[in-house]
């Protein structure tokens, strides 16, 4: 039953992506990106709905051409979550999705083209209250910066970002957020640290092209964990070569581990050993699958023996300690004994009961407040 995070977040300007606040005192928003063909409206909408069910706050959609822009407009009408249009090279695509109701434009002013084209995009965004994300990536730095630095470096990423920030400053546009992504953890972390000291706009965190489900999760957790623990970051996207729904799950798990955001069950479970009095791994796998729909923030401890079990269980909303018989704790106090027969069924029932009680108690607090 952990309290608030001890992390002091960096002060930043608040912007709005649709109805989702980003920056300032807003919760850190979790983003993902579709990997369907945007022209396949049905498939893209279906994937977005799966992301919404997983708890995503903002979804980015690639819009590579005008056909995709028209498809984007149809998609926008069929979903409720804020959508970011990912646009490169052709400024007319940005103008079109602005007309169609996009919630945020992800652009790199450096590849949009001449000053008048950037101004046209910014004017369209300003007129419709649409924020912009300046997205700098180590894999697509400007040629002059590649020549100056020889290779991507944190300083090169920040110089590119500040160049684009100054560009928007000249156009008197402040409704934007910035990212400086790299696939190398140290490069990305240092770039974000440097940039955080120089601008007040919200920062979109990510380790780009992090890898597959396992390797990408580890790299993202290490890199984003370092930054978030320092108070840097206002929205995150976990880039995985995997089902985008996994990006949302990993994002929430990272935030939960730092007590920055709570959604669903926070499991505390031992890796198990020969002391276990029930099959911890099997129990955990079953519980995670069964309770995936539960959104109420709860700490649940599943410990196989009495070495650490009682101590962990006493700190959880619901705790299971292996023994003969096993002992259930509710809100830190011994509540009942369970045998291994129907253990998962009984534990699931108790967790759902505790979740319902918590919802009722929270609602009562709101009414009294």
Curated annotation (Swiss-Prot):
Keywords for this protein: 4Fe-4S, Iron, Iron-sulfur, Isoprene biosynthesis, Metal-binding, Oxidoreductase
Named cofactor requirement(s): [4Fe-4S] cluster
A GO MF term: 4-hydroxy-3-methylbut-2-en-1-yl diphosphate synthase activity (ferredoxin)
Co-factor note (free text): Binds 1 [4Fe-4S] cluster.
Reaction catalysed by this enzyme: (2E)-4-hydroxy-3-methylbut-2-enyl diphosphate + oxidized [flavodoxin] + H2O + 2 H(+) = 2-C-methyl-D-erythritol 2,4-cyclic diphosphate + reduced [flavodoxin]
Coiled coil segments of this chain: none
Pfam (any one): GcpE
One GO biological process term: terpenoid biosynthetic process
Binding site for [4Fe-4S] cluster: 270, 273, 305, 312
EC identifiers of the protein: 1.17.7.3
Record-linked SUPFAM superfamilies: Inosine monophosphate dehydrogenase (IMPDH), Nitrite and sulphite reductase 4Fe-4S domain-like
Broad EC category: oxidoreductase
Pathway the protein takes part in: Isoprenoid biosynthesis; isopentenyl diphosphate biosynthesis via DXP pathway; isopentenyl diphosphate from 1-deoxy-D-xylulose 5-phosphate: step 5/6
Function according to Swiss-Prot or TrEMBL: Converts 2C-methyl-D-erythritol 2,4-cyclodiphosphate (ME-2,4cPP) into 1-hydroxy-2-methyl-2-(E)-butenyl 4-diphosphate.
Family: Belongs to the IspG family.
Name of the featured protein: 4-hydroxy-3-methylbut-2-en-1-yl diphosphate synthase (flavodoxin)
Organism: Pseudomonas putida (strain GB-1)
């Amino acid at each position: 039953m952990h309290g608030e995070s001890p992390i002091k977040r960096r002060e930043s300007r608040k912007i709005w992506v649709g109805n989702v606040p980003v920056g300032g005192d807003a919760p850190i928003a979790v983003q993902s990106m579709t990997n369907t063909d945007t022209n396949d409206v049905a498939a893209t909408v279906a994937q977005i709905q799966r992301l919404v069910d997983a708890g995503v706050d903002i979804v980015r959609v690639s819009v590579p051409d005008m056909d995709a822009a028209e498809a984007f407009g149809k998609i926008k009408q069929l979903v409720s979550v804020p959508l970011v249009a990912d646009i490169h090279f052709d400024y007319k695509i940005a103008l079109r999705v602005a007309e169609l109701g996009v919630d945020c434009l992800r652009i790199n002013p450096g590849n949009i083209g001449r000053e008048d084209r950037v101004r046209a995009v910014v004017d369209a965004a300003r007129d419709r209250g649409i924020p912009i994300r300046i997205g700098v990536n180590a894999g697509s730095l400007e040629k002059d910066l590649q020549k100056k630095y020889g290779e991507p470096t944190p300083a090169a990423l920040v110089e590119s970002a500040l160049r684009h920030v100054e560009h928007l400053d000249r156009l008197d546009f402040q409704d934007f957020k910035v990212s400086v992504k790299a696939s190398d953890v140290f490069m990305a972390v240092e770039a974000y640290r440097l940039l955080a000291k120089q601008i007040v706009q919200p920062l979109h965190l990510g380790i780009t092209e992090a890898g597959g489900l396992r390797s990408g999760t580890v790299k993202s957790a290490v890199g984003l964990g370092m930054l978030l623990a320092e108070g840097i970051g206002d929205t995150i996207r976990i880039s995985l070569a995997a089902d985008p729904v996994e990006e949302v799950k990993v994002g929430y798990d990272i935030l939960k581990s730092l007590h920055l955001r709570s959604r669903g069950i926070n499991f505390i479970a031992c890796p198990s050993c020969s002391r276990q009095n029930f099959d911890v791994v099997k129990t955990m796998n079953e519980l995670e699958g069964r309770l995936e729909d539960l959104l109420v923030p709860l700490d649940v401890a599943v410990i196989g023996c009495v070495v650490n079990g009682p101590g962990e269980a006493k700190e959880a909303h619901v705790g299971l300690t292996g023994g003969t018989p096993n002992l259930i704790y509710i809100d830190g106090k011994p509540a009942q004994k369970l045998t291994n027969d129907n253990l998962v069924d009984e534990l699931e029932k108790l967790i759902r009961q505790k979740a319902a009680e918590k919802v009722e108690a929270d609602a009562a607090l709101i009414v009294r407040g």
